[in-house]
């Protein structure tokens, strides 16, 4: 066992580790019998060291024997951070497993104002502020597939461990190598209890009053589906619950500060609803005052419930009791993957391998093969058939496990069963593959979609209750009389309810603002107006959600003072008809326009006049599958000629290059500008599409569809995921879509600027075109107030 440790701290320059590492669960990395070393090695203690973004921090530690260590860290997030701190870890110069490349540390937030009864009844969500307090945690994989702790391999003797801050900065006050916490089961814990059982009245803690949370998105929300929700109203939207779809990702937590009246043993219950993932169970881990309690509370399962139900954790046929001393305590509920954590990484790997097999098949057959032709796949790609058979056996075992732990299965077992049966047909007769290729692709996508939903652990909480084991707690459902009265009152109220998301009256003039944004965005905008804008302005903003035509309202003389989220083409149409205000006439416009890129104002300008301010902007990027283009020997295209060069290799392997469909002219505009052309003349009085540059750009653009047969219609997300289209130009929103909906290709794709055109001086022009919406001010008598709001 370890007798001593040698600790050396150094700060190294930014570097990239060459060894990416295998997955954590790989048998060659972590054996099923992990030998953990339990003597602590202190790397940082008694001092505070700032880990700055971009730096690498190296420590040397002497281990008396070979074994595995967990890393325990006490840290404080830096105030200059804009997101979660992320670090990577290497041991003895190597990344031991791929999960060590990106390890996130949680932030901490609280309500800016206390959630009093008045705030609850107002329906106005308090602003969320980050709390810069010390937190203690074990380094764990970002997806939390492997529980709360990652164990790193150390050899006997001297070891070097390096921490590289990939993003943001933290202040570290303690850093330990240790064996992790040893959590007892409930029977062991119960035998050590000394307090008596609580015999008083049940203690209710409103869930929406959570003191701390891991994300700013975890705030109190309204639920008006039940008369038994506490508190509730048939007429107003009380902030009476917390969680739901915003509390679903592994690692997210909520903390409540509770106070108990005496030293005693308490049973804990929750009123909850989980109506998002049908047939699935959402899991939570409970800790008290920062410590795990027992193994049973590390995976509390909240089953699917379309209506509110009560949940009390049990051990056998008895409720689990918590030994709490008199006074205040912190109860934390953290999202965990639960019983599926052991198979989801395996499914993710299977999806990746199935996509690879599918891609290798279409390299032979094409994506639309002739079902009557025998492509001799047994000879062409025998290794693919062997892989498919191995994956079939894996899926069959996983399906049985899921059916067992989910007590009868779920949508996942049906999806796995369908895919397993198909793979069995492929194994018996490879000739059937071409006829079922489209369904094979669909089944892979279905498995990936289910995997994403299985990772999601949504849970809505109304309240928590502490009572004695025999205490009588409130029913989760309302009585028939309560339900009828509540629903009847709600129905009657609909005849007089104002469905607009208006701000409170402020006094002074009233400015009417229309927007076509969603209800959530509208509520956020309303809150920003009331919390910030009203502090410095003495007039009322009447905010309305309107999806009808603004043009008809203007023509009828019923239009608003301002409109948000308007298409730039519509804004200029109103400008030509003298219906909107030229913003350039305001004295401080020259200062305001510096907030935006000059190009963002081009589409709403004419000569020296500017008729709107940008509201949203979207543009194209180049997305590429790094694994596939590396395999094919294709470099990331920097120019359009690079794309053409890559097309020969892609076509030879029956793969595609995706360029936005002809109805999306942004790619053509990009080529036009890169070739030195423009849409209009200098005075913007005539189009210049007949110029040499314009015709050259149009020819270049159209040849991708005529000469190179790029598909005119395609699903960029799915074809990129499967690898059919390893290079695609798409809207920037695809970045977020892939991060959320394509976990199986995480780390296997990248994003770059759209291809450019080489200039005479050798530089590459990557000029692109953007799609925008804007905010306009209609001609009215409240110009100054409207300008104050708009800017």
Task: Kindly give the residue locations of the regions a language model identified.
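Sec-dependent signal peptide cleavage junction
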Residues: 9-20
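Extracytoplasmic "Venus flytrap"/periplasmic binding protein-like
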Residues: 531-599, 603, 626-638, 726-727, ...
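Glycine-centered hinge/linker elements that transmit conformational signals in sensory
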Residues: 684-713
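Extracytoplasmic/periplasmic substrate-recognition and gating elements
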Residues: 65, 262, 742-791
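Hinge/lid segment of periplasmic solute-binding proteins
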Residues: 487-507, 568-621, 642-644, 746-755, ...
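Periplasmic solute-binding protein
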Residues: 575-578, 597-636, 655, 661-685, ...
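Extracytoplasmic
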Residues: 19-468
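Short, well-ordered beta-strand elements
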Residues: 506-519, 533, 539-544, 562, ...
């Amino acid at each position: 066992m370890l007798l001593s440790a040698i600790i050396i701290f150094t700060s190294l320059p930014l570097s990239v580790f060459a060894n990416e590492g295998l997955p954590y669960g790989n048998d060659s990395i972590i054996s099923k019998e992990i030998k953990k070393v339990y003597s602590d090695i202190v790397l940082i203690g008694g001092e505070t060291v700032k880990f700055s973004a971009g730096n690498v921090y190296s420590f040397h530690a002497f281990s008396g024997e070979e074994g595995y260590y967990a890393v325990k860290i006490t840290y404080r997030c830096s105030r200059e951070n804009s997101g979660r701190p992320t670090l990577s870890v290497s041991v003895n110069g190597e990344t031991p497993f791929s999960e060590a490349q990106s390890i996130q540390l949680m932030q901490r937030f609280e309500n800016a104002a206390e959630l009093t009864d008045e705030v609850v009844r107002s329906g106005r969500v308090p602003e969320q502020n980050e709390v810069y307090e010390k937190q203690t945690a074990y380094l764990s994989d970002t997806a939390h597939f492997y529980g709360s702790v990652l164990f790193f391999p150390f050899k006997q003797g001297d070891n070097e461990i390096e921490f590289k801050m990939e993003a943001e900065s933290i202040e570290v006050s303690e850093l330990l190598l240790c064996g992790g916490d040893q959590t007892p089961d409930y029977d062991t814990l119960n035998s050590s209890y000394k307090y008596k059982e609580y015999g008083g009245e049940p203690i209710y803690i409103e869930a929406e009053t959570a003191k701390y949370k891991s994300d700013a998105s975890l705030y109190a929300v309204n639920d008006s589906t039940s008369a038994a929700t506490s508190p509730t109203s048939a007429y107003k939207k009380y902030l009476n619950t917390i969680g739901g779809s915003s509390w679903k990702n592994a690692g997210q937590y909520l903390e409540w500060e509770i106070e108990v009246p005496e030293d005693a043993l308490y049973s804990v219950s929750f009123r909850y609803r989980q109506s998002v993932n049908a047939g699935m169970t959402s899991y939570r881990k409970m800790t008290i005052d920062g410590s795990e309690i027992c193994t049973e509370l590390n995976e509390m399962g909240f089953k699917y419930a379309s209506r509110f139900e009560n949940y009390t954790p049990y051990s056998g046929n008895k409720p689990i009791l918590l030994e709490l001393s008199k006074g205040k305590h912190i109860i934390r509920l953290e999202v965990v993957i639960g019983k599926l954590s052991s198979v989801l990484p395996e499914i993710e790997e299977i999806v990746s391998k199935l996509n690879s097999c599918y891609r290798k098949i279409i390299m032979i057959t094409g994506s639309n093969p002739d079902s009557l032709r025998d492509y001799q796949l047994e000879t062409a790609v025998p290794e693919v058939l062997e892989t498919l058979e191995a994956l079939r056996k894996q899926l069959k075992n996983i399906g049985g496990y899921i059916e067992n732990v989910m007590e009868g299965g779920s949508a996942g077992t049906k999806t796995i069963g369908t895919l397993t049966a198909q793979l069995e047909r492929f194994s018996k007769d490879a000739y059937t593959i071409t006829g079922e290729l489209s369904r094979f692709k669909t089944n892979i996508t279905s498995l990936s979609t289910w995997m994403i939903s299985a990772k999601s652990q949504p849970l809505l909480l109304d309240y928590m209750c502490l009572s004695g084991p025999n205490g009588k707690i409130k029913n989760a459902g309302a009585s028939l009389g309560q339900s009828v009265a509540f629903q009847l009152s709600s129905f009657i109220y609909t005849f007089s309810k104002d469905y607009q998301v208006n701000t409170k009256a402020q006094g002074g003039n009233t400015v009417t603002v229309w927007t076509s944004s969603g209800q959530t965005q509208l509520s956020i905008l309303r809150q920003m107006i009331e919390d910030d804008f009203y502090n410095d302005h003495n007039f009322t903003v009447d905010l309305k959600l309107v999806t009808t035509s603004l043009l008809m309202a203007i023509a009828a003389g019923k239009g608003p003072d301002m409109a948000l989220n308007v298409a730039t083409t519509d804004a200029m149409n109103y400008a030509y008809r003298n219906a909107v205000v030229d913003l350039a006439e305001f004295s401080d416009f020259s200062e305001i326009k510096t907030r935006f890129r000059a190009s963002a104002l081009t589409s709403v300008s004419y000569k020296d006049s500017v008729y709107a301010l940008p509201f949203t902007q979207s543009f194209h990027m180049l997305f590429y599958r790094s694994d596939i283009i590396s395999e094919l020997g294709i470099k990331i295209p920097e120019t359009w000629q690079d794309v053409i060069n890559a097309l020969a290799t892609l076509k030879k392997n029956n793969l595609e290059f995706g360029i936005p469909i002809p109805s999306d002219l942004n790619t053509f505009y990009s080529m036009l500008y890169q070739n030195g052309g423009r849409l209009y003349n200098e005075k913007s009085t005539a189009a210049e599409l007949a110029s040499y540059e314009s015709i050259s750009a149009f020819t270049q653009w159209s040849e991708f569809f005529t000469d190179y047969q790029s598909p005119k219609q395609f699903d960029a997300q799915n074809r990129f995921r499967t690898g059919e289209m390893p290079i695609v130009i798409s809207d920037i929103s695809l970045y977020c879509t892939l991060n959320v909906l394509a976990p199986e290709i995480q780390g296997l794709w990248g994003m770059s600027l759209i291809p450019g055109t080489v200039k005479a001086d050798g530089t590459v022009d990557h000029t692109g075109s953007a799609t925008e919406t804007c905010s306009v001010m209609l001609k009215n008598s409240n110009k100054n107030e409207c300008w104050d709001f708009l800017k």
